[in-house]
Structure formats: C-alpha cells, structure tokens
Regions:
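FMN-binding flavodoxin-like domain, especially the glycine-rich phosphate-binding loop
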Residues: 2-4, 14-17, 21-35, 48-143
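Short acidic active-site motifs
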Residues: 41-46
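Cofactor-binding loop segments of dinucleotide-utilizing enzymes, especially the Rossmann-like FAD-
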Residues: 9, 38, 90
Length: 143
C-alpha cells in the first residue's frame, strides 16, 4: 500500500474540498493519503517519505498562490524524480495555476505525472465530485 501527499493552497475552502475528494479516490483504491494545508509545509523533511505527490492551488489574478510557489522551491530539493504526481485547482475566472504546477512537476521535477491537471470551478458543480475522486483513483493506480 502506497502513500500520497496532497498539498493545497486556497482561500475559500474550494481547493481543500477538491483535495479531500482526491484523497477519497486514493483511499478507495486501497492507498493512504494525507491532505496538508500549504502553511504546514515549512521544510524539505515535510515532503519526504511519500510515493505520490499531488499539489493544488487556487488561481488568483491568473497566478497560483504565493505559498504554492514557495513550496515548489522546497519540493525541487526533495528529489521527486520518477515519483507519481498530479496537480489540481479551483478557479473563478481562469484556471492557470494547476497547469503551471503540472508543468513544473513534469518538466523540472521529472515526475511521472497522471493524465493532466484537474481544474474545477467547484467540486460541487458539473460532476466535480466524481472527477476529483476519479483523479485520485488514477493517481493511486500508478503507484
């Protein structure tokens, strides 16, 4: 049984809701998942010891949240090459953050990424619950 770390950055609670649903999908597949607010990640050691990493941020003014940018610099020092990865985010008008996180994880960290980033306006709209849980299941199938 593998372990996944899901780190999220958001203000309204929507990004956390998506993170929790992704974790449910991972657990349905029989793996462990820890959901952590970005404010709890302060050092490289906070990111070590997992088989999969899923990073998510809300998009504000076309950008990921500053806490996620800072955490990605820490993650770069963690040695994530070859680890399973995914990205997600909630947005109101535009959804650039999940794609930028995904590109960083794939091209800089050289991670084994799942299909693509998960971008939802809300976990509760348009099948969002199923999409987020399905994303978690897809991640769990890779490790």
């Amino acid at each position: 049984m593998g372990k996944a770390l899901i780190v999220y950055a958001g203000r309204s609670g929507e990004t956390k809701r998506i993170a929790d649903l992704i974790a449910e999908g991972i657990r349905i597949q029989g793996s462990e998942a820890s959901v952590v607010n970005i404010t709890k990640v302060k050092k490289v050691e906070d990111l070590e010891g997992f088989d999969a990493y899923v990073f998510g941020s809300a998009t504000y003014h076309g950008e990921m949240m500053q806490g996620m940018k800072t955490m990605l610099f820490l993650a770069e020092k963690t040695g994530l090459e070859g680890k399973v990865g995914g990205s997600f985010g909630a947005f109101g008008w535009s959804g650039e953050a999940p794609g930028r996180i995904f590109d960083t994880m794939q091209n800089i960290f050289k991670m084994d990424m799942v299909n693509g980033p998960l971008m939802l306006k809300s976990a509760l709209l348009g099948g969002g619950v199923e999409m987020a849980q399905g994303y978690g299941k897809d991640i769990a199938k890779k490790f």
